[in-house]
Amino acid sequence: DILATEGHFKPAVEGRETPGGGLAVVVDPGPRTTIADVELHFSGAAGGAAERLDALRAAWALPVGQPFRQGDWDAAKQQLLDGLSLRDYAAAAITASEALIDPESASARLRVDIDSGPAFRFGSIEVTGLADYDRSLLERYQPPEPGEPYSQERLLRYQTALQNTPYFASVVVDIDRSTATPEAA
């Protein structure tokens, strides 16, 4: 199993008795599996953003010919998901993924299905726990505007601005990821 995570699916293991009565184990990992085919399928509102989807396909981290490793496969899927969920599509999710391994040909066929969900926009700010200060204090630090397209980076910038003030010991800024109201996240 350890060799499989590194892309070796046809190892040969041989045990030999040593002159001193011990056992020597010789492992030939076999050929490293390489990517033979990649299919990336998108559904949801991002389906109309052809340039963005083309850019995500071009940036796919495991192209044909690359060695297959489990860690790289996991990272490539996360990078693909982040390419949607960090900007505009906060509810994006991988709905299916598979790596079909053929040990005989040392090849892998990869498929990822991802649903972007709806495009999100920032809504009005809901505040809890602001007992000691007037709500207008928050406006000084440039919150996202209602209707502005969702961006995780924009959200974190606002949270950081609030955390860097002397007014708050801790701050959590997040959106409602409910797909029922993506226009007012």
Give the location of each predicted region.
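Periplasmic polypeptide-binding modules associated with outer-membrane biogenesis and secretion
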Residues: 1-185
